[in-house]
């Protein structure tokens, strides 16, 4: 979705709202170079966990061990949330100071964008684990269909949030969260 977000965001804010290219680039930079970088770290842990769970899920699925599958799913979700929730909460609450420390950016806008970190980290961690579980039980087409549907919904929501509600860069952040929720 990020591949499409930048041109959609850029065309709408510069074309419709007459925002300068410099301002647009600054706002997109906050989103892509700070917000996305910091939220991707805990999501990467969930991604590595999901990679590790697939072989065990396949083994339980082939053996028709329902209890084993349920235990593995439960453990993966618990461990993922054990990492995602505190990381997301920390980024959400301490986003301003973290950005000041790492990037020298103490702006209020950056701190406000970081408030959304909790939701982003949790929903993307859950969707990553869920997709791995579906792959482990031989339901490969479901994540693909869900991603396609989520992308369409994401683009519609992003456009509405930008054009109707004029949420600027926050529309991209909220659109990103809705993508993770619907996957």
Regions found by a protein language model. Give the residues of each.
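Hydrophobic alpha-helical transmembrane segments of multipass membrane transporters and ion channels
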Residues: 1, 78-86, 119, 123, ...
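Residue-level recognition of transmembrane alpha-helices
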Residues: 33, 80, 114-117, 121, ...
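Membrane-interface junctions at transmembrane-helix termini in multi-pass inner-membrane proteins
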Residues: 119-149
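Alpha-helical transmembrane segments of polytopic membrane transporters and translocases
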Residues: 19, 23-46, 78-79
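Interfacial segments at transmembrane-helix termini and the short loops linking adjacent helices
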Residues: 74, 92-122
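Short alpha-helical transmembrane segments in multi-pass integral membrane proteins
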Residues: 72-92, 169-183
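Helix-loop junctions and terminal segments of transmembrane helices
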Residues: 43-64
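Membrane-interface helix-loop junctions in multi-pass transport and translocation proteins
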Residues: 141, 151-183
């Amino acid at each position: 979705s990020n591949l499409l977000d930048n041109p959609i965001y850029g065309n709408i804010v510069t074309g419709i709202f007459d925002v300068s290219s410099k301002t647009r680039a600054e706002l997109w930079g906050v989103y892509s170079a700070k917000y996305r970088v910091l939220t991707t770290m805990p999501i990467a842990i969930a991604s590595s966990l999901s990679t590790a769970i697939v072989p065990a899920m396949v083994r339980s699925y082939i053996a028709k061990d329902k209890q084993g599958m349920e235990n593995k799913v439960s453990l993966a979700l618990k461990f993922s949330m054990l990492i995602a929730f505190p990381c997301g909460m920390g980024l959400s609450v301490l986003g301003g100071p973290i950005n000041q420390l790492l990037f020298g950016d103490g702006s209020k806008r950056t701190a406000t964008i970081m408030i959304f970190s909790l939701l982003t980290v949790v929903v993307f961690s859950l969707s990553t684990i869920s997709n791995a579980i579906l792959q482990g039980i031989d339901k490969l087409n479901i994540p693909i269909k869900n991603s396609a549907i989520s992308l369409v919904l994401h683009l519609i929501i992003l456009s509405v949030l930008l054009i109707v509600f004029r949420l600027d860069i926050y529309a991209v952040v909220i659109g990103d969260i809705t993508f993770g929720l619907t996957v």
